Design a protein with these regions (language model features):
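N-terminal secretion/transport leader regions
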Residues: 3, 243-244
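Core nucleotide-handling region used for phosphoryl-transfer chemistry
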Residues: 9-47, 52-243
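Short acidic, low-complexity intrinsically disordered linear motifs used
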Residues: 1-9
Length: 244
């Protein structure tokens, strides 16, 4: 895509929105990218690394003893009063979708997730969802609906949570432990392996030094150097300058 000629905003990720890749942060400098690549290839990134999975986005909450879902920002308003109600509601919401694989992915995932969440105690559901003002963002990995990365397993990946006020505005949230906590609760009830999906949290990885380090780092840094050379840019320039 020629960003200069085709300057549209692409909205992805359902109600949550698109989670940017590193190269989409146009405020980064080229030397930042070089540093990230070197740290990744040498095993120098400290701690655990979260894999950015490539699936279909949905948000889930619980209100008035019912599992509810959000696919657009309007569903968050009034603490989920007008959200999609249960797996049946998801089936109706996607009922006229032209892609049967997408329809199946969301419908089956909603059924399995609904069953998993309803296995929790009332105290757990209240703690996790707060009766519709706290939502957990999930990603549906369904091999038939592959975007870019192919997968061999059917997974519901629980990510972070966000809290919303009555008007549907974000007022809080996290990026780390919430999905893992909810997945752990569901696993304790032995409902994490469902009819179609396994309910889990974001994969955590450790990156060791690559074996063919010299060749690999030369290839990656060579691509960045070629891009800088093409547009007459320096390591201290922001990568967004290559797109304007």
């Amino acid at each position: 895509m020629n960003f200069k000629a085709y300057n549209r905003v692409i909205e992805e990720g359902g109600a949550y929105g698109h989670m940017m890749n590193v190269h989409e942060d146009y405020t980064l400098q080229f030397e930042d990218l070089q540093r990230i690549i070197k740290q990744a290839l040498t095993g120098g990134i400290k701690g655990e690394i979260k894999e950015k999975t490539d699936g279909q986005a949905l948000a889930v909450s619980h209100r008035a003893n019912r599992v509810i879902f959000a696919r657009n920002k309007g569903h968050y308003k009034a603490f989920g009063k007008n959200a999609i109600r249960g797996a049946k509601g998801i089936a109706e919401f996607f009922g006229e979708h032209p892609n049967d694989n997408v329809k199946e992915a969301f419908t089956f995932a909603a059924k399995d997730l609904e069953k998993g969440i309803m296995s929790l105690s009332d105290r757990q559901k209240q703690m996790m969802f707060g009766d519709g003002w706290r939502w957990v963002n999930i990603e549906i990995i369904w091999p038939a609906t592959v975007n870019v990365i192919p997968y061999n397993h059917e997974l519901i990946v629980l990510h972070n949570f966000r809290e919303y006020d009555e008007d549907g505005n974000t007022v809080g949230g996290d990026f780390n432990e919430y999905g893992r906590m909810l997945a752990g609760m569901i696993k304790q009830t032995n409902e994490h392996v469902q009819d179609k999906f396994t309910i889990t949290s974001m994969p955590l990885l450790k990156m060791p030094r690559v074996k063919n380090f010299e060749q690999t780092i030369g290839d990656y840094l060579g691509e960045i150097n070629n891009l800088m050379s093409k547009y007459g840019l320096n390591p201290g320039d922001k990568i967004g300058r290559a797109h304007v």
